[in-house]
Amino acid sequence: MSGQINRRTALGEAIFNIASNTSYKSYLEIGTWNGQGSTKCFLDGLLPRDDEWSFYSLESDPSFYNQSINFWSDVEKNPKVNLLLGRIIDEDELIDINNLKKQDPVKKEYPIWKQNDLNNYQQVENIAHLLPEFFDVILLDGGEFSTLAEF
């Protein structure tokens, strides 16, 4: 299933163009999800390149991580591509539900989503120490409760 961010969207095309640009060498994406959205936009631009580059994509939901690994099984062995299960912040850094916009139309879903994030964070390790210190390009798309702290 194609992701919300894909090559048919302006953001997806911008990600593809940035990934195709050999001026940038190191990429980090937080929020792989199923690997078929922004991850695909990045890899569509990166995989044809014949220069040195590295791509790290993190997912904290084990189920979606497994979907991404299955989708990208043909490139999983590429040492430039690092699809990782983990997180870079801790549970206590997730934003409190009450600090999100009151008018958000999906607010009623927040308690469920927050609990899912907490459950996932208890299952996966903080792997920030395994990542390079600097990246040329970073996309933060981890979620409602984590993205500000990840920034």
Model regions and ranges:
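A short alpha-helical cap/connector motif
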Residues: M1-F151
